[in-house]
C-alpha cells in the first residue's frame, strides 16, 4: 500500500506546505483514494502520478475549509476532462450541500454521478475489491472521523499436498481455488477455496486521522494497525499557550499514545503554519519531531508535501523519494 501527502499544513497553506490532502492506493494509482481535499489539491495532484480519472472514492474527515475547499474545483475539472465513472464521496452530510450549492451557483455541471455516503452513519462501512474502510469518531470542534483502511482479497497460496492427497488433479479448478472461488467437480464434490488455500501474510492496515485532540479514541482501532497518520498541529508548549479551544493534538500527545499501544509506524502531519521548514527558521518544524521522539520509540516520520510512503507486504514502512 502507498500513500502520498498532497498537503501537510493546518488551517492555511505556507510556501512549502499546502493544506490537507492524502492520496492512497493499494498497488498502483489505478484505482486510488483521496482523504480530504483542501484548497489547491488538484494543483498538487498535477505533480504526482495520480489522475482524477482513476479516483475511486473521496473520504472527508470533517467539514472545515482546509479539508474540503478543494472539492468543487477537483470535481468540475474531472468533468471537463471527460470523466463518466461514478464517484463515491464519503463525508458528513454538509459536504453534499456544499458541493451542490457551489455547482448550482457557478453555472457548473458534472458529466458523472456522485454517490454521497454519510460518514457519520453508526454502521458505516465501505469497500471495493482492494480495501475495506471503517471509521472512528474523533474529538474536534465539529464532527470528525478517522478512516481505517484494511487490505482485502489477499493473494492465496494453494495447499498442493492436500489437493494431491484428495485426488484433485492440477487443472483449471486449481486456478479457481487460488482466486478464492469454490469449485464443483464433475463427480459432484464441492471444493471450498478456504479448505484448499491459505493466505500466507497479514492484511495491511493504515489509519488516516482527521483533526483530533484525543488520540486515545483510536486505541481499539490501533490494534493490528501498521501505520497511524495523525495530526500534530503544535508542540506541547504552543498547545499550552493556545489553550484547548482549537481541539488539536500536540506532537507529545500523539507520540505518547502511539507508544502506549505499540504502534510500529507513526507519521505526523497537519502542522501549524507557524512552523518553518527553511534552515534557521523559528519555530522550526523539526521541533515537532524532536518532541515526539522523546516519547515514541517506533518508526517516526514527519510528513512533507509530495512525500510518498510504501507499506510493504512484510509490513515495513519506507519513505520514497518526493513524488514530483
Can you describe what each PLM-predicted range is?
Residues 39-90, 118-119:
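Active-site metal-binding motif and surrounding structural segment of the metallo-beta-lactamase
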Residues 70-77, 102, 276-290, 313:
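Metal-dependent catalytic neighborhoods of phosphoester/phosphodiester hydrolases
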Residues 8-9, 39-40, 63, 94, ...:
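Active-site metal-binding loops of divalent metal-dependent hydrolases
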Residues 83-87, 92-118:
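Active-site neighborhood of divalent metal-dependent phosphoester bond hydrolases
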Residues 1-50, 84-86, 147-149, 156, ...:
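Conserved beta-strand hairpin/beta-sheet module of binuclear metal-dependent hydrolase folds
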Residues 178-306:
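Cap/insert and terminal regions of metallo-dependent hydrolase folds
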Residues 14-16, 129-208, 212-220, 227-229:
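Active-site-proximal loop/helix segment associated with metal-binding centers of metalloenzymes
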Residues 126-135, 313-324:
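Short, surface-exposed amphipathic charged segments that create phosphate/polyanion-binding patches used
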Amino acid at each position: 500500500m502507498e500513500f502520498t501527502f498532497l498537503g501537510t499544513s493546518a488551517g492555511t497553506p505556507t510556501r512549502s506546505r499546502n493544506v490537507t490532502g492524502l492520496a492512497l492506493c493499494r498497488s498502483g494509482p489505478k484505482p486510488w483514494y483521496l482523504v480530504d481535499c483542501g484548497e489547491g489539491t488538484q494543483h498538487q495532484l498535477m505533480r504526482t502520478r495520480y489522475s482524477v480519472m482513476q479516483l475511486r472514492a473521496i473520504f472527508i474527515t470533517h467539514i472545515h475549509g482546509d479539508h474540503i475547499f478543494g472539492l468543487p474545483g477537483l470535481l468540475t475539472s474531472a468533468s471537463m476532462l471527460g470523466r463518466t465513472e461514478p464517484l463515491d464521496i464519503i463525508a458528513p452530510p454538509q459536504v453534499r450541500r456544499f458541493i451542490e450549492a457551489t455547482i448550482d451557483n457557478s453555472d457548473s455541471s458534472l458529466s458523472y454521478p456522485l454517490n454521497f455516503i454519510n460518514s457519520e452513519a453508526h454502521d458505516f462501512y465501505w469497500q471495493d475489491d482492494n480495501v475495506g474502510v471503517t471509521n472512528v469518531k474523533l474529538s474536534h470542534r465539529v464532527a470528525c472521523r478517522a478512516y481505517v483502511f484494511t487490505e482485502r482479497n489477499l493473494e492465496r497460496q494453494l495447499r498442493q499436498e492436500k489437493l494431491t492427497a484428495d485426488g484433485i488433479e492440477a487443472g483449471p479448478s486449481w486456478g479457481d481455488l487460488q482466486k478464492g472461488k469454490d469449485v464443483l467437480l464433475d463427480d459432484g464434490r464441492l471444493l471450498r477455496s478456504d479448505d484448499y488455500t491459505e493466505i500466507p501474510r497479514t492484511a495491511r492496515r493504515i489509519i488516516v486521522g482527521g483533526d483530533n485532540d484525543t488520540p486515545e479514541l483510536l486505541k481499539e482501532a490501533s490494534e493490528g494497525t501498521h501505520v497511524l497518520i495523525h495530526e500534530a498541529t503544535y508542540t506541547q508548549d504552543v498547545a499550552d499557550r493556545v489553550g484547548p479551544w482549537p481541539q488539536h493534538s500536540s506532537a507529545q500527545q500523539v507520540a505518547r499514545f502511539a507508544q502506549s499501544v505499540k504502534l510500529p509506524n507513526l507519521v505526523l502531519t497537519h502542522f501549524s503554519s507557524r512552523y518553518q521548514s527553511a534552515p534557521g527558521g523559528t519555530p522550526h518544524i523539526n521541533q515537532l519531531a524532536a518532541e515526539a521522539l522523546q516519547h515514541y520509540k517506533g518508526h517516526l516520520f514527519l510528513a512533507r508535501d509530495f512525500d510518498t510512503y510504501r507499506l510493504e507486504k512484510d509490513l515495513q514502512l519506507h519513505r520514497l523519494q518526493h513524488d514530483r
